[in-house]
């Protein structure tokens, strides 16, 4: 079985994230959406709600599961026996960041494949930060997140 891990804070999971998950689900036998408990960010949703929202959004994908994680990604990869890490890339800026992370993870893990996937053009401009900003001002984000995620978002 080929397991890939798609890590992120997913605060909240967007249509762009879902696009990447769906692509990965078509490539790998199993995909784990690993929801990070990020101490560096102040989240819109706590980790349990982010996992629940992600789980609801990927319910149509039989080979995808969601779970929280702490610590180094390479430790989770070893623990789960994953063959690859999946990341989404929207543009040049994302590529440079992801390249640096992939090389660092490879050094930490000895060898680790990172699969960079590009979302559909209509999802390129979507970012969780944008969603959080709109939610904070009481705006409509239904065109940015999967319908299953909407009930988890705070109402302003």
Where are the language model's segments positioned?
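Nucleotidyltransferase catalytic core that binds NTPs
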Residues: 1-156
């Amino acid at each position: 079985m080929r397991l890939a891990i798609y890590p992120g804070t997913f605060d909240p999971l967007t249509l762009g994230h879902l696009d990447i998950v769906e692509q990965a689900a078509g490539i790998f036998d199993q995909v784990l959406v690993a929801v990070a408990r990020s101490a560096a960010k102040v989240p819109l949703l706590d980790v349990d709600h982010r996992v629940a929202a992600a789980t609801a959004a990927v319910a149509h994908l039989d080979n995808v599961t969601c779970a929280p994680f702490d610590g180094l990604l390479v430790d989770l990869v070893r623990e789960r026996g994953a063959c690859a890490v999946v990341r989404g890339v929207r543009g040049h800026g994302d590529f440079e960041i992801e390249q640096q992370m992939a090389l660092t993870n490879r050094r930490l893990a000895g060898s680790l494949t990172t699969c960079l996937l590009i979302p559909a053009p209509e999802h390129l401009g979507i970012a969780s930060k944008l969603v959080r900003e709109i939610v904070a001002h009481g705006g409509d984000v239904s065109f940015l997140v999967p319908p299953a995620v909407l009930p988890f978002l705070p109402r302003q």
